[in-house]
Amino acid sequence: MAALHTLWMGLVLLGVLGVLQTRAQAQVSRQPNFQQDKFLGRWFTSGLASNSSWFREKKNALSMCISVVAPSAEGGLNLTTTFLRKDQCETRTLLLRPAETPGCYSYTSPHWGSTHDVWVVATDYEEYALLYTAGTKSPGQDFHMATLYSRTQTPRAEVKEKFSTFAKTRGFTEDAIVFLPKTERCMEEHR
């Protein structure tokens, strides 16, 4: 069960930022003129899509969580995410290391020990952000995830449609896309 929890946390944290060029993901677009200072603050994980078998099995049991993005001393970002686990609130922090391109970050997966790249594909900074994450869990097992971050717990229908369209362009099918249900549990820590 701890491994499943770590995977869920990794999935949430994966989705949070950046754009790194990798051989496999060279076609991933990114937010032009990304402004890290505008990206800081509170975000709700509102939508996810992933090729992970664990995600596909557990997606209906997941609920919205909250993340706070803050600058790190190294010029990257500290991503602190609070979520409900076994009827208790749990908080984890992940260091997103900056790449050469603004908005590009990478991190080491606490579950797999591998490096994952994160792209901020699109954001208006005030309402939503679309993110894409890619990495390798183990030899021959590539990991991909699309994430919708929202500044509120109730993203507009147009934003949700934008996320669905984006996820489908990255190869996710309709059944691999989930919008996480709103919850009040574990949200008060970051209000």
Curated annotation (Swiss-Prot):
Its EC number is 5.3.99.2. Keywords: Cytoplasm, Disulfide bond, Endoplasmic reticulum, Fatty acid biosynthesis, Fatty acid metabolism, Glycoprotein, Golgi apparatus, Isomerase, Lipid biosynthesis, Lipid metabolism, Mast cell degranulation, Membrane, Nucleus, Prostaglandin biosynthesis, Prostaglandin metabolism, Pyrrolidone carboxylic acid, Secreted, Signal, Transport. The active site is at 65 (nucleophile). InterPro entries: Calycin (IPR012674), Lipocalin (IPR002345), Lipocln_cytosolic_FA-bd_dom (IPR000566). It is an enzyme of class 5 (isomerase). Glycans are attached at residues 51, 78. One of its GO terms (cellular component) is extracellular region. Disulfide bonds join 89-186. Its main location: endoplasmic reticulum. It is found in: Rough endoplasmic reticulum; Nucleus membrane; Golgi apparatus; Cytoplasm, Perinuclear region. The keyword Ribonucleoprotein does not apply. GO terms for biological process: mast cell degranulation; prostaglandin biosynthetic process; regulation of circadian sleep/wake cycle, sleep. N- and O-glycosylated. Both N-glycosylation recognition sites are almost quantitatively occupied by N-glycans of the biantennary complex type, with a considerable proportion of structures bearing a bisecting GlcNAc. N-glycan at Asn-78: dHex1Hex5HexNAc4. Agalacto structure as well as sialylated and nonsialylated oligosaccharides bearing alpha2-3- and/or alpha2-6-linked NeuNAc are present. The modification Pyrrolidone carboxylic acid is found at residue 25. The keyword Amino-acid biosynthesis does not apply. One of its GO terms (molecular function) is small molecule binding. It comes from the Eukaryota. It catalyses: prostaglandin H2 = prostaglandin D2. Forms a beta-barrel structure that accommodates hydrophobic ligands in its interior. Catalyzes the conversion of PGH2 to PGD2, a prostaglandin involved in smooth muscle contraction/relaxation and a potent inhibitor of platelet aggregation. Involved in a variety of CNS functions, such as sedation, NREM sleep and PGE2-induced allodynia, and may have an anti-apoptotic role in oligodendrocytes. Binds small non-substrate lipophilic molecules, including biliverdin, bilirubin, retinal, retinoic acid and thyroid hormone, and may act as a scavenger for harmful hydrophobic molecules and as a secretory retinoid and thyroid hormone transporter. Belongs to the calycin superfamily. Lipocalin family. Monomer. This is Prostaglandin-H2 D-isomerase. It comes from Felis catus.
